[in-house]
Amino acid sequence: MTILIDADGCPVVDLTLQIAKRFVAPVIILCDTAHQIEREGAQTLVFDKGADSVDFALVNRVKPGDVVVTQDYGLASMCLAKCARVLNQNGLEYTADNIDALMLRRYENKKLLRAGKHPKGSPKRTKEQDVRFTDTLEKILNCNH
């Protein structure tokens, strides 16, 4: 079981590495040339900047039982299809039960953007989000050990 991080814009890279170290779980950080992220204790793979280049590289590497950290619903859906466990930076685990609704929300938001309506941005990251992320990742890793 490997933890793969879609690291472009991911606020929990270091937190993931701390947790992975306790579980002796290997970590692969995937990013594009605009976000080169090197961390001790992880393998970093860097890809050309471009639409979905990191996403497709991650999907090509993920295996059943792996854990993926991403905030991208489309990538999450593809990883679920490959029998990976997937969570976002706030500790929400994507599942077959919630991914369709999340994909629909993404579609609706894109329609609003095309119509010139911009949804509010994300609020500042909180300690509670880190706690939820930690709890969810530890729960997943405990199931896989």
Please provide the spans of the model-predicted regions.
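Nuclease catalytic cores that cleave nucleic-acid phosphodiester bonds
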Residues: 2-145
